[in-house]
Amino acid sequence: MSNESCLPYYTAHSYSSMSAFKTSMGDLQRQLYNRGEYNIFKYAPMFESNFIQINKKGEVIDVHNRVRMVTVGIVCTSPILPLPDVMVLAQPTKICEQHVRWGRFAKGRGRRPVKTLELTRLLPLKFVKISIHDHEKQQLRLKLATGRTFYLQLCPSSDTREDLFCYWEKLVYLLRPPVESYCSTPTLLSGDAPPEDNKSLVAAELHREGDQSETGLYKPCDVSAATSSAYAGGEGIQHASHGTASAASPSTSTPGAAEGGAARTAGGMAVAGTATGPRTDVAIAGAAMSPATGAMSIATTKSAGPGQVTTALAGAAIKNPGENESSKSMAGAANISSEGISLALVGAASTSLEGTSTSMAGAASLSQDSSLSAAFAGSITTSKCAAERTEGPAVGPLISTLQSEGYMSERDGSQKVSQPSAEVWNENKERREKKDRHPSRKSSHHRKAGESHRRRAGDKNQKASSHRSASGHKNTRDDKKEKGYSNVRGKRHGSSRKSSTHSSTKKESRTTQELGKNQSASSTGALQKKASKISSFLRSLRATPGSKTRVTSHDREVDIVAKMVEKQNIEAKVEKAQGGQELEMISGTMTSEKTEMIVFETKSI
């Protein structure tokens, strides 16, 4: 009786899901059945072949001038699993290698050489990705969860089938079904698919969940737990990590296939998931609540019927605010139907920080019923400004504070300093400098006219007293310069050169005297006109003690008056909409206000 008929539970011939397992027992399976240390592999169907290890270029890796032979076996450890779940690797033992020469002589005598294998790796297929590296050279590529990659080339014996690599290709296709896009959820087929194919693909995708990426990053605790016999037997994984609890159950073909839940009391987290219907309806719901993180809820529902696909997704996240913390809330919903292809999305966001709140709302709709329509609406509301929050409780809205900044009060003449931009400040400075030049020119003109008038009066006095005290005026250099012409004109009994000089200076003094009289008359008229204008301006101007300064002495008086030349103002309106929200509307014009300092100086003549 063969070994195949001795299998009491089930054999590879009774495994109807895959034809690759309908083969005779190999060396590894026979060894595990006869004297294996793992009872779980004793009655499990296995598909095995011999490979040699190569590199990526296809070159054979030689270790000590010998080829490394590897036996790869794909095992299904439980009859309730639709697909195999474990990959085993074995290699010849050292004792077997030492007796290779003896095996050659034994083979010549008609006896088969004894070949002993030892298991070196036991890997769940969840953490191994098998792919075809080279079809012509019959090479496979193994990508482990740790990131390591191995390349194997099929090395069949002489008595094996020629199409052995075709079975490996079919097995790789079953373990890695081609899907449109990889996702973390199981692949759901339409209702027209056969029940067996639907079952196989869904289970394969469940086993391949999280292993679609090339990086293959997994936690060490997951890898260690998955290598246990409980996982290999299809009983699932139950482990605790970082104070969390999770549970999973294998999927079956009956309605209400799987129900799982996880809860964590310390963090206030609860997760629940259900799968109903003939592998077409899935519902997942989760919630996490904590005083620090708030609450979060996500729900997903997908149902497939004849000619109709419906998907709904809703989520919400809330963060509880503290004294100086902000709070945000968002909500969204989406609905897709194959009949009319409609989509709806609603979202809201709110932020509150010490009296400042912002809210937004949007909606979009898309429908395909021989027409296309879309709509969106949004609003932003701001209640307070940052300046009012720093200074104290707010009295008015944001625009009211802007209205009171940047202009001078007409009552007290004081100017409230704001913080304008650099460009506006430079323009204002240039205007002030330009306007400050004109009063300085006028005051210098008045001072020059007064000095010339006093000089002419002094010249007249000096002319009258030049005959009496001509020698007394020769003590200082300044008096000589100012009174030179009068002294020369007073010497009537000099030389011929002096007489000619006397005549020329006499004429010049007469002309200058006449011009001085004309200029003095015109200057007095201009001064009278300007004095009348200044008096009218002073009457119209509201002078305050803080803006006017007077310096008096026995012979002069100085007045400093501040005049408003420009004004800056911003007008705004604040209206309340429905719901108590304040809406700000800015209207009016904006002008600038500046002041100019005018200096009046009066001296006694």
Curated annotation (Swiss-Prot):
Residues 434-457, 489-500 have a biased composition (Basic residues). InterPro entries: GARIL-like_Rab2B-bd. Residues 463-473, 513-526 have a biased composition (Polar residues). The keyword Chaperone does not apply. It is found in: Golgi apparatus; Nucleus, Cajal body. The modification Phosphoserine is found at residue 592. GO terms for cellular component: Cajal body; Golgi apparatus; nucleus; sperm head. Its main location: Golgi. A motif (Bipartite nuclear localization signal) lies at residues 441-458. Residues 239-265 have a biased composition (Low complexity). It comes from the Eukaryota. Residues 234-265, 407-529 are annotated as: Disordered. Expressed in adult spermatocytes and spermatids (at protein level). Pfam families: GARIL_Rab2_bd. Residues 475-484 have a biased composition (Basic and acidic residues). Keywords: Golgi apparatus, Nucleus, Phosphoprotein. One of its GO terms (biological process) is penetration of zona pellucida. Belongs to the GARIN family. Interacts (via N-terminus) with RAB2B (in GTP-bound form). Interacts with FRG1. May be involved in RNA biogenesis. This is Golgi-associated RAB2 interactor protein 3. It comes from Homo sapiens (Human). The lineage of its organism: Eukaryota, Metazoa, Chordata, Craniata, Vertebrata.
